[in-house]
Amino acid sequence: MSSDLIEAGRGVRSPVEDVSGVMPSARGSRHHWAVMLAGGDGVRLQSLTLRIAGDSRPKQFCSIFGGESLLTQTRARLESLFHVDRELFVVTRAHETYYRDELRNVDDSRIISQPLNRGTGAAVAVALLHILQRDADAVVVFVPCDHYYSDTEAFGRAVRSAISGAEQNPNSIVILGAEAHYAEVEYGWIELGSAISDAPVPLLRVNRFWEKPSLPQARALLRRGCLWNTFVTVGRASTFVDLLCSQLPEVILSINAAMAENELEAAYRLMPTIDLFAARFGPSASSTVGGIRYDAGMDRS
């Protein structure tokens, strides 16, 4: 299915420059891509961003923890891990007032501006289709831009481990789970099971995702050693596409057809809003999703 989508998308202007002839650097393989997901509306924290920034901008464009915005902090965490031309940003057109300044030094070809916010399902799908036009062997890291990590070096090591895990297990999606330090009810949780692979990267099967559990449930998850879900998700682009074709066929097929006809806005207007990570990984977790445990001092805004 993924090869059919790549073929159907040919002829669409790529969002990234073709630099396949450039020699590799210390930033890892040129098949490694980072996609920063910055298209959310941030409705839950609008009252907070209003107090901090003086307007109701989405939280990724706000300095929630002081200093730089969450988006800028996310960029900084990834800059040593990926080639610059392999870093893409998925944003929403209505937020251009905010992201245009944040991304003023980023070439327009690396900014995927969605006509509307339709959740992570659409954001992941449109990014994958853009990448697969350029690199059929891509390994993609999807990173939400609404998290804070106190230990950026540990985060970088965890991302590298997740990439290695995805390369060792090409039919699996790998998700990072952060060590939980208290029974947080506003976070998603991951319950890990048996080992998928041990060396060199220990990868554990995800038995279940828990999205915003009750306090008694969160306490039980903490006692069982379950992890906070960072939603940092890694896998081969073709594996992601196969998952989307299985779980969200109407989304990825609609976007693929719309890209070929330059009718993306019309497709988005007809599309439901779907959170891929919260709603769609669960049914496939036992067979396709593995987790890596790490501790980088995560705090989700």
Residue ranges and their predicted role:
Residues 2-58, 63-160:
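Conserved N-terminal catalytic core of the sugar/cofactor nucleotidyltransferase
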Residues 24-29, 54, 80-82, 133-135, ...:
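Solvent-exposed alpha-helices and their adjacent loops that cap or buttress functional pockets
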Residues 42, 49, 75-82, 103, ...:
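Structural signal for hydrophobic packing residues in well-ordered secondary-structure cores
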Residues 44, 96-98, 148-150, 182-185, ...:
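Short, active-site-adjacent cap segments at secondary-structure transitions
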Residues 61, 111, 173-175, 289-291:
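Conserved beta-strand scaffold positions in the cores of enzyme catalytic domains, especially
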Residues 117-122, 182-184, 215-216, 297-300:
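A short acidic, often aromatic-flanked loop/helix-cap motif at beta-alpha or helix-coil junctions
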Residues 151-184:
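Conserved donor-nucleotide/metal-binding helix-loop-beta segment in metal-dependent transferases, i.e.
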Residues 189-301:
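Catalytic core of tubulin tyrosine ligase-like
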